[in-house]
């Protein structure tokens, strides 16, 4: 029964394979294997596009970052490219969607966010404590403002991860539901395929935008620690 097979649409996000060996998580190493330039004697078109994108993003991130150590921007560029490539590869049929899982996203966001927090406390803990009380706050609200600022500080990596996961999950679910709809109405197949191609193109751009948003917010958090 088709109803039984499609009863749980979220099964496509399960990190498991048919041979009872979770090989899907090895896909996270695929961008590192495919794109290193040391294996190219002559620069390929893909590497040319990647280098052009890296130069463009470096100039963009340099404006946002207030750090005097501009070399740190390379970390965020690498993170953005990794998330973008992983998001785009996950649109290929039967490819496991890594960045739809909070586990991977939380590892990326928590690691960087926590390192920024330690860096800020180590360098200037007085400034860190002063940020917990906004300027010109009433005295009777100071304790309450400290609690609010701490909560807003703690939920930052969670909001980053949930935003990325939710956008990817919603996009994949829409494509899946549209594919089920196409299989039930063969008579209007050309129109459905055109709509699905438009949604797929939109999902590709969404994957690029989400990787940019994820990285740019981390840069803003990093600039606060400086």
From Swiss-Prot:
PROSITE patterns: ATPASE_A. Its main location: mitochondrion. Keywords: ATP synthesis, CF(0), Hydrogen ion transport, Ion transport, Membrane, Mitochondrion, Mitochondrion inner membrane, Transmembrane, Transmembrane helix, Transport. Coiled coil: none annotated. It holds the Pfam family ATP-synt_A. InterPro entries: ATP_synth_F0_asu (IPR000568), ATP_synth_F0_asu_AS (IPR023011), ATP_synth_F0_asu_bact/mt (IPR045083), F0_ATP_A_sf (IPR035908). One of its GO terms (molecular function) is proton-transporting ATP synthase activity, rotational mechanism. Mitochondrial membrane ATP synthase (F(1)F(0) ATP synthase or Complex V) produces ATP from ADP in the presence of a proton gradient across the membrane which is generated by electron transport complexes of the respiratory chain. F-type ATPases consist of two structural domains, F(1) - containing the extramembraneous catalytic core and F(0) - containing the membrane proton channel, linked together by a central stalk and a peripheral stalk. During catalysis, ATP synthesis in the catalytic domain of F(1) is coupled via a rotary mechanism of the central stalk subunits to proton translocation. This is ATP synthase subunit a. It comes from Apis mellifera ligustica (Common honeybee). The gene is ATP6.
